[in-house]
């Protein structure tokens, strides 16, 4: 160690550490008493230091190896000790310069501030203790100078106005001291004008910068008295702070504008969101506070509390204090100044550093003088704060109206219009183009003029081609050029006629000019074909048929192929307008026929391809036109006749045609777009390595398609269909939603919705979101309130447009009110219709509609802001305020996860990102201009910051990489040159650079070599759990190269298959790509071990980053495995990936439902399922190979992983996703599709059953293990899986049935025939399974034997505790299903014998009498008020539905009439003497069912009932034989009870009872007369012949033996009619695939005794190993321990420039490389409550002891999991508690907006079914044995709603 000055001693030795090196860091050393600092020495990394204090050798830990370090001290020798003194600058270099000598300064100080770009620093400070301190000197008051009015705007241009821009818009001033300002504006320095202050002001207050620096430092480490120290960069401001700031801000006096120019704020991303609105609302703020507020007794330097947080301004803080904002870092600046350069004149005042309370206290001394001014100023501040909007301009689709930008297009496109006019003028002046004849030599046209025509015509074509690049621009310019201007029309017509004239072309002297002339004409016709004005002018005025002229050229002999193709392009473009198509199709020679003939005669493939593109374009027009006609016919012109079969059939046919048109449009948008284009140099082949796209052809087709959509009013058709969706078939309704989603994925659809159909779009969004009216602007609401009778200028135009589109609007009807979407929104009603108050619907019923509405609203709003930004950027006057306002709004949209996704999708479309790239270039040029006057200064610009933020958002979150191909190189260079920008922008660019690293490889998007990408991924694996951006981007690029674009709903293969993707997949597979993907999945699953415990982290941005890695990994793995299995077929046996795929699914299951990555999680789940289904591709031929097939092995691995409590529910859900959904499924409209699907569905289920059969034992074990579960959610999901398994084939349903039966019997026998809780659970589990038709059939086939004996034994039990009662209730419910003939595999259209169908639906006929006896015996033995009694009566009622069961029931009642009458007496007595009970209504229903026959259902395959009891039998049944005659009849007693309790009795039961009394009375009348007389007519109507009925009851009806279960399976229905709006849960895929939410499970399914008390401590002692370290393992699982991996993994995102340090593994002692994670900012400084003393001097000592812990001791403590505290303690906060954030990334921004996100979640996520999956993954037609339908129905097993087959039952027995 080098010698130091004599007398110097070591004052301080310690290490400071920080998380990141990306920020300038500050640290403070405080000494216990004043000292002279003589030397500061930095200890390099690894350097050994021998110290005199205890502890021996220490090691340096300074990192990085080079940086600049500035030192500041509190100079106690200066007057009032108020100035920070610059002690010096050390340019640290570990090999050269490590110490700073300060012996010359001799400054007395008690604190040292360090500022530098370091992450860790070890330093030693030497000095001399002293006691000399200069006393403070009082100072006179300084007069307040007014602020100059000259202020510059954001672009640097001078604005001579009084409104002062807010501080956050201003840019930092250079720290130099210059001369006083002049009075002339031109003499101002630009940076002076930026701040509105002169250099005089700055010169006068030069020393006050140090005061502001110290106050800034002090504020950065102190908080309010009642709040704990918040985490670094996450200061939360309370309301008390807001009020305190308002009070303090009045002390600023006339220097309120002042702020530290050099230490300007290092804004976070959240800060930028607030900058945007400051200028907009600047008029609401007072420019300066009253001058009299300054204290007259003592001058005060300007308070700089606004030094850092823009949100600390009161108007932000009052409304947005709930946002978290990052604290800010200090900027680097020039700080070396000599004492001579400072003014030390008496006029320069100094003051001691005071606390905030002291400042406020000083104000109290002047209250008598300043009270009025203070109150007025505070009122101004509070009013401005109340009027200020929130920091984040949240877009709320349910509340905020959609907007469309209506800029001044004439001014915007004036240059293009003038250029076009100039070119035509030159053509007219320099050539003879009056007509074709004038172009010839005979009329004086020279050779030069003819050649000039070609030159100028090509220039004109170039300009027209430029116009055609933008649909809106082309239409506007041509409409302005030709609209009502005969001169221009005449000029263009003449030029076009000459250009298309073969004669004129032949007049060209040179052959080259002849060809150029013809090409010129073809191109001009193509470019001018979209103008209807010109087309009409040519036809009417010139009698010129442009189609005829083009075809004449086409058929000229020896015409070259290239020219023919160009002429066909002209024909193609001329068909963009309705007038062009009508003329083309209606000509003398039909144009369509001409094209067909040309195809027949064409010999070249390229010619045929171009001709068929014209045909397809005409078909597309016809389809869109027919949709408009059919929608008008269906919903506007038609009068609905209920029950009209012809009308229903016509509707089905029409809807089928609409579906075909929609499929054609979706096909044209994506999958087969190439077949609609006219690409250059394209040879159509079936397979090609790469199809080179032609942007011009794509743009031409896009323009044509948008024109077609507008001319055929597609949006109006969609609106009408959406409003009348109840009348649509399911497939049509879903096809319409698919089309809307497809349109929103393309820029053509978004442009159409915004530019051509905006009023209708607003109404569509309102319907999708379930709103009762379109949201309006507040201004519009006020206008409407003031002028209720006036037409609203904004919204009523929309309604008129909708009415014009519909012409004959339909009024809202009752039907529409029952729709699943918003009932009040429909086609607007006529004015004459009565005013019906709409019922407000705040939420949609269907989640898919809401998601579609949110997507549409965000994308339309994004287009509005993009248009506004583009117009403002191109305006002659660069208005940065307007730009920043719109950019802030679009930035705010990205604060919501859904809005962020939809916003970046729009940015990635149609080269929209170019808008922001151009803005960045423009801002860079402006900064270069500013730097001419102030070299080296980095200016701030909100426009630049927002533009960089939006590019960053696109880079981070946009999955489509078209933007990267276009702008990737520019973005990469921008990120590399981040140091040229101010720090806040530089930090964003540095983080963006990590994402852009893969683009450093040469030609990364070339398909020849993907090894650079594989290397990037391999390198990133070590840092996988930090979610590095380079890995995310590399995986996205690899996915782009290896997988063709996903085409939703693609049914036909593309025209030309590209082989490049398969080539990349082969390269990746050869480079161990499968293992690479498995490693990524394995590490993520290991990091989130026990994922249920990580749910809070998965809810945050950490979950988003996890999915950003997981999704492309799964997609690539699926592509590789699918291709490998397809190629190798049955020889592929690698099952390595299955375990990892299942674990990934478990991890995805535990993502919270409404997490930020919700859509990505669902997509990842689908990818896992589809990847597993790839193992079902091989076709096995024999039974032996079937047992070892890849399909069977995959199922075995999946079942094997359902191995623990945390895996039961997600494992069953995965199994449910893999298995086919139960039949029947919705019936397609097309009969041909129905036949195709039928065979495929049956074959698919047979194959699944065959491959599951070898795993029968494993399936049985799974059911046995989970069936007794008391957890309702698990039991519910297992029931669904069992139903899916049993639906496959007879062998699987028998497996499930036998497993359940064995479980029940074994449980009963094991418990010595005593019912147990476990048996009750199993019976309750079986109840629902027996109501499922396939399982009922198999259960009935094995019912005879011990299964029935179990039921009989349970029903015979007479001890009635809760367990027995519940068991008996379950048995009754099972018998209910067994006896219900409506639950059957037999279709209602079955042609078999009805008796045979009945035999299949009932238990074996020999068991039926025993079942009836057991039910009746149980009924008579239980209490009449018990629920079992009602269930037993219900089963007896079901027995009356068919003759066979009715016969045996009647025989039993005759045999046991005494018991029946005794039971009746008990029921009647209870109701007479105790209380009214519903069992008396059950008795009435039973008697009614015995005596009356219900009318048969319309469609039934079961035999009709013919038997019933007559009046005599009824009398025998209800009349007692041995009772007193004084007692009234039974029915009369029942009537008395019903009349007595009429208020609660059921009216239907009372009506039935009166009919029974009448029937009994008819029997008494017969007895009073002759016994041989016939019954009265009334009885004859009810019973045709009593005697015949009685006779029939003596003969048992015939019931044949039931068919086998295999035969029943073959006869079951495959399809059923399905209504998309029907409220039947079983008809949707969600019912089968989603676990039942716990909150929806009824209490009756979870009895109280099932909630078993449990002592977790005892359970842990029993189940866990005594040697297990629970605390340590818990920390390890939660990544809270100090293991070598954990600290690296705690950082949620990768830092830009990774730094590493050596850690020691506690177990092994070996060093381990790990990511460096530092302590929170502030070094654990205490935060005492404010006091009147000096905060700097009153802070308790924390780093002042020289013998303190060294960095190595810190690392040892940290590694062992300890929490070091004390003077150098880290006081680390785990990342889980601190929140998921790093630096300034977008994640911290979103995490910070907690209140905003919570509001959005409440708004978007309130319905419980909001996050339900949109449907089955099986909608993709290319999956193996997949189904294109996502909804399934099953009327055969859905159970009877009232328990009596297909006939309705009285409501009182529900």
UniProtKB/Swiss-Prot annotation:
Keywords: Coiled coil, Developmental protein, Differentiation, mRNA processing, mRNA splicing, Nucleus, Phosphoprotein, Sexual differentiation
Subcellular location: Nucleus
GO biological process assignments: cell differentiation; mRNA processing; positive regulation of border follicle cell migration; primary sex determination, soma; regulation of alternative mRNA splicing, via spliceosome; regulation of mRNA splicing, via spliceosome; RNA splicing, via transesterification reactions; sex differentiation
Keyword Ribonucleoprotein attributed: no
Purpose of the protein: Associated component of the WMM complex, a complex that mediates N6-methyladenosine (m6A) methylation of mRNAs, a modification that plays a role in the efficiency of mRNA splicing and is required for sex determination. Required for sex determination and dosage compensation via Sxl alternative splicing: m6A methylation acts as a key regulator of Sxl pre-mRNA and promotes female-specific alternative splicing of Sxl, which determines female physiognomy. M6A methylation is also required for neuronal functions.
Subunit-level organization: Component of the WMM complex, a N6-methyltransferase complex composed of a catalytic subcomplex, named MAC, and of an associated subcomplex, named MACOM. The MAC subcomplex is composed of Ime4/Mettl3 and Mettl14. The MACOM subcomplex is composed of fl(2)d, Flacc/Xio, Hakai, vir, and, in some cases of nito. Part of a complex containing fl(2)d, Sxl and vir.
Name of the protein described by the UniProt record: Protein virilizer
Gene designation: vir
């Amino acid at each position: 160690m080098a010698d130091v000055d004599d007398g110097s001693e070591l004052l301080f030795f310690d290490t400071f550490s920080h998380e990141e090196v990306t920020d300038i860091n500050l640290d403070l050393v405080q000494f216990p008493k004043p000292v002279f600092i003589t030397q500061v020495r930095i200890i390099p990394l690894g350097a050994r230091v021998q110290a005199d204090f205890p502890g021996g050798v220490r090691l340096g830990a300074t990192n990085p190896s080079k940086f600049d370090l500035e030192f500041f001290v509190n100079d106690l020798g200066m007057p009032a000790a108020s100035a920070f003194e610059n002690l010096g600058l050390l340019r640290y270099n570990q090999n050269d310069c490590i110490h700073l000598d300060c012996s010359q300064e001799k400054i007395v100080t008690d604190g040292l501030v360090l500022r530098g770009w370091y992450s860790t620093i070890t330093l030693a400070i030497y000095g001399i203790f002293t006691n000399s301190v200069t006393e403070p000197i009082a100072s006179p008051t300084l007069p307040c100078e007014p602020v100059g009015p000259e202020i510059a705007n954001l672009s640097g241009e001078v604005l001579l106005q009084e409104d002062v821009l807010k501080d956050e818009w201003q840019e930092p001033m250079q720290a130099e001291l210059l001369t006083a300002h002049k009075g002339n504006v031109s003499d101002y320095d630009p940076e002076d004008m930026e701040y509105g202050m002169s250099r005089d002001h700055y010169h006068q207050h030069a020393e006050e910068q140090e005061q502001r620096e110290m106050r800034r430092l002090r504020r950065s480490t102190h908080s309010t008295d009642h709040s704990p120290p918040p985490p670094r960069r996450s200061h939360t401001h309370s309301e008390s702070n807001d009020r305190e700031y308002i009070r303090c801000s009045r002390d600023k006096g006339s220097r309120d504008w002042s702020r530290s120019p050099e230490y300007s704020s290092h804004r976070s991303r959240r800060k930028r969101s607030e900058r945007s609105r400051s200028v907009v609302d600047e008029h609401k703020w007072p420019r300066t506070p009253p001058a009299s507020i300054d204290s007259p007794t003592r001058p005060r330097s300007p308070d700089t509390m606004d030094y850092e947080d823009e949100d600390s301004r009161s108007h932000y803080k009052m409304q947005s204090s709930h946002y978290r904002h990052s604290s800010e870092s200090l900027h680097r600046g020039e700080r070396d100044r000599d004492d001579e350069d400072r003014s030390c004149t008496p006029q320069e005042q100094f003051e001691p550093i005071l606390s905030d309370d002291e400042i406020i206290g000083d104000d109290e001394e002047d209250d008598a003088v300043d009270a009025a001014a203070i109150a007025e100023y505070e009122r101004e501040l509070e009013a401005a704060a109340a009027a200020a909007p929130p920091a984040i301009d949240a877009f709320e689709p349910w509340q905020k109206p959609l907007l469309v930008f209506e800029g001044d297009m004439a001014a915007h496109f004036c240059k293009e219009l003038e250029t076009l006019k100039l070119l035509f003028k030159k053509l007219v002046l320099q050539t003879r183009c009056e007509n074709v004849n004038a172009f010839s030599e005979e009329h004086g046209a020279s050779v030069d003029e003819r050649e000039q025509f070609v030159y100028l015509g090509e220039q004109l074509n170039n300009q027209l081609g430029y116009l055609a690049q933008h649909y809106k621009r082309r239409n506007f310019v041509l409409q302005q050029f030709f609209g009502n201007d005969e001169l221009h029309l005449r000029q263009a017509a003449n030029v076009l006629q000459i250009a298309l004239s073969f004669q004129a072309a032949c007049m060209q002297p040179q052959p080259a000019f002849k060809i150029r002339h013809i090409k010129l004409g073809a191109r001009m016709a193509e470019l001018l074909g979209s103008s209807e004005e010109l087309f009409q002018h040519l036809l009417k005025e010139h009698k010129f048929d442009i189609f005829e002229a083009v075809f004449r050229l086409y058929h000229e002999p020896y015409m070259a192929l290239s020219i023919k193709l160009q002429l066909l392009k002209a024909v193609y473009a001329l068909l963009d307008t309705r007038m062009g198509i009508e003329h083309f199709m209606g000509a003398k020679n039909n144009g369509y026929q001409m094209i067909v003939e040309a195809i027949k005669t064409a010999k070249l493939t390229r010619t045929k391809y171009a001709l068929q593109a014209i045909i397809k374009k005409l078909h597309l027009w016809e389809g869109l036109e027919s949709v408009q006609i059919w929608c008008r016919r269906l919903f506007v012109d038609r009068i609905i006749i209920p029950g009209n079969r012809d009308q229903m059939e016509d509707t089905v046919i029409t809807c089928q045609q609409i579906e075909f048109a929609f499929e054609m449009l979706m096909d044209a948008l994506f999958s087969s777009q190439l077949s609609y284009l006219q690409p250059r140099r394209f040879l159509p082949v079936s397979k090609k390595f790469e199809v080179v796209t032609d942007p011009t052809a794509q743009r031409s087709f896009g323009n044509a398609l948008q024109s077609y959509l507008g001319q055929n009013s597609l949006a109006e058709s969609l609106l009408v269909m959406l409003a009348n969706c109840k009348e649509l078939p399911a497939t049509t309704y879903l096809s319409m939603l698919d089309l809307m989603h497809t349109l929103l994925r393309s820029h053509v659809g978004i442009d159409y919705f915004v530019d051509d159909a905006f009023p209708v779009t607003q109404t569509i969004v309102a319907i999708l979101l379930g709103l009762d009216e379109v949201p309006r602007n507040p201004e519009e609401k006020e206008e409407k309130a003031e002028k209720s009778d006036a037409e609203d200028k904004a919204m009523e135009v929309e309604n008129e447009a909708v009415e014009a589109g519909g012409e004959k609007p339909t009024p809202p009807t009752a039907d529409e009110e029952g729709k699943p979407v918003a009932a009040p929104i429909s086609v607007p009603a006529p004015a004459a219709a009565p005013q019906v108050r709409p019922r407000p619907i705040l939420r949609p019923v269907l989640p898919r509609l809401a998601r579609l509405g949110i997507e549409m609203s965000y994308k339309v709003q994004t287009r509005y802001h993009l248009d506004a930004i583009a117009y403002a950027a191109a305006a002659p006057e660069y208005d940065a305020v307007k730009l920043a306002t719109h950019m802030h709004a679009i930035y705010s949209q990205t604060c919501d996860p859904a809005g962020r996704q939809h916003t970046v999708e729009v940015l990635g479309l149609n080269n929209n990102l170019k808008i922001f790239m151009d803005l960045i270039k423009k801002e860079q040029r402006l900064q270069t201009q500013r730097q001419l006057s102030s070299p080296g200064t980095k200016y701030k610009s909100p426009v630049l910051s927002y533009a960089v933020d939006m590019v960053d958002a696109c880079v981070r979150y946009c999955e489509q990489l078209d933007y990267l191909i276009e702008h990737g190189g520019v973005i990469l260079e921008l990120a590399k040159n981040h140091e040229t920008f101010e720090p806040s922008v530089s930090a964003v660019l540095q983080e963006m650079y990590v994402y852009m690293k893969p683009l450093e490889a040469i030609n990364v998007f070339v398909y020849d070599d993907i090894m650079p990408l594989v290397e990037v991924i391999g390198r990133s694996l070590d840092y996988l759990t930090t979610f590095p951006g380079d890995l995310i981007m590399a995986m996205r690029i690899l996915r782009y190269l290896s997988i063709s674009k996903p085409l939703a709903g693609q049914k036909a293969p593309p025209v030309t298959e590209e082989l490049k993707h398969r080539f990349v997949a082969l390269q990746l597979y050869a480079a161990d790509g499968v293992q690479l993907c498995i490693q990524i999945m394995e590490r993520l699953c290991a990091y989130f071990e026990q994922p249920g415990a990580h749910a809070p982290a998965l809810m945050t941005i950490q979950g988003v980053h996890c999915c950003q890695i997981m999704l492309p990994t799964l997609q690539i793995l699926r592509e590789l495995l699918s291709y490998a299995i397809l190629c190798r077929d049955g020889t592929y046996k690698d099952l390595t990936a299955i375990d990892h795929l299942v674990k990934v699914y478990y991890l995805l299951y535990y993502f919270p439902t409404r997490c930020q990555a919700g859509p990505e999680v669902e997509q990842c789940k689908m990818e896992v399922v589809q990847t597993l289904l790839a193992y079902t591709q091989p076709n096995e031929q024999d039974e032996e190979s079937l047992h070892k097939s890849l399909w069977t092995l995959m199922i075995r691995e999946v079942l094997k992983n359902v191995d623990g409590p945390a895996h039961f529910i997600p494992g069953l859900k995965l199994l449910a996703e893999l298995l086919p959904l139960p039949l029947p499924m919705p019936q397609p409209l097309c009969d041909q599709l129905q036949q195709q699907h039928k065979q495929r569905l049956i074959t698919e289920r047979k194959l699944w059953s065959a491959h599951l059969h070898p795993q029968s034992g494993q399936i049985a074990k799974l059911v046995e293990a989970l069936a007794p579960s008391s957890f309702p959610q698990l039991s519910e999901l297992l029931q669904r899986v069992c139903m899916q398994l049993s639906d496959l084939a007879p062998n699987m349903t028998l497996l499930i049935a036998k497993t359940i039966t064995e479980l029940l019997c074994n449980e009963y026998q094991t418990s010595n025939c005593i019912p147990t809780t476990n048996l009750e659970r199993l019976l309750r589990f079986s109840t629902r399974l027996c109501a499922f038709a396939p399982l009922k059939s198999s259960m009935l086939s094995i019912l005879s034997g011990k299964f029935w004996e179990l039921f009989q034994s349970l029903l015979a039990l007479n001890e009635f505790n809760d367990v027995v009662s519940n068991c008996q209730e379950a048995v009754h419910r099972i018998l209910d299903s067994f006896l219900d003939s409506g639950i059957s595999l037999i279709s209602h259209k079955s042609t078999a014998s009805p008796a045979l169908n009945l035999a299949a639906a009932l238990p074996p006929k020999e068991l039926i009498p025993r079942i009836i006896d057991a039910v009746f015996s149980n009924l008579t033995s239980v209490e009449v008020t018990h629920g079992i009694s009602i269930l037993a009566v219900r089963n007896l009622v079901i027995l009356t539905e068919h003759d066979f069961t009715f016969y045996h029931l009647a025989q039993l009642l005759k045999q046991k009439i005494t018991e029946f009458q005794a039971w009746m007496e008990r029921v009647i007595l209870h109701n007479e003497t105790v209380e009214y009970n519903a069992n008396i209504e059950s008795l009435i229903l039973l008697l009614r069912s015995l005596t009356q026959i219900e009318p048969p259902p319309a469609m039934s395959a079961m035999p009709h009932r013919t038997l019933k009891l007559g009046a005599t039998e009824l009398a025998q049944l209800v009349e007692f034989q041995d009772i007193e005659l004084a007692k009234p009849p039974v029915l009369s007693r029942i009537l008395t009870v019903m009349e007595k309790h009429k208020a609660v009795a059921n009216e239907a039961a009372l009506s039935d009872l009166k009919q029974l009394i009448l029937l009994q009375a008819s029997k008494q009348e017969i007895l009073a007369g002759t016994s041989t007389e016939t019954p009265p007519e009334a009885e004859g109507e009810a019973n045709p012949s009593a005697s015949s009925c009685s006779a029939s009851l003596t003969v048992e009806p015939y019931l044949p033996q039931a068919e086998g279960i295999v035969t029943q399976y073959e006869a079951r229905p495959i399809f059923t009619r399905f209504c998309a709006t029907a409220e039947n849960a079983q008809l949707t895929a969600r019912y089968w695939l989603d676990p039942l939410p716990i909150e929806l499970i009824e209490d009756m399914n979870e009895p109280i005794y099932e909630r078993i008390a449990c002592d977790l401590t005892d359970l842990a002692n029993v189940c866990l190993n005594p040697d297990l370290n629970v605390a340590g393992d818990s920390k390890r699982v939660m990544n809270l321990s100090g293991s070598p991996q954990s600290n690296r993994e705690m950082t949620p995102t990768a830092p830009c420039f990774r730094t590493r340090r050596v850690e020691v593994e506690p177990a092994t002692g070996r060093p381990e490389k790990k990511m460096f994670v530092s302590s929170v900012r502030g070094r654990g400084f205490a935060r005492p409550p404010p006091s009147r003393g000096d905060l700097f001097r009153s802070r308790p000592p924390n780093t002042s002891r020289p013998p303190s812990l060294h960095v190595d001791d810190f690392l040892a403590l940290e590694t062992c999991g300890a929490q070091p505290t004390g003077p150098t303690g880290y006081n680390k906060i785990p990342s889980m508690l601190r929140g998921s954030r790093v630096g300034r990334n977008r994640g911290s921004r979103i995490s910070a907006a907690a209140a905003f996100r919570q509001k959005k979640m409440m708004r978007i996520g309130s319905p419980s079914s909001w996050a339900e999956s949109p449907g089955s993954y099986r909608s993709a037609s290319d999956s193996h044995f997949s189904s294109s339908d996502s909804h399934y129905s099953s009327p055969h097993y859905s159970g009877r709603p009232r328990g009596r087959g297909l006939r309705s039952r009285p409501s009182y027995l529900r």
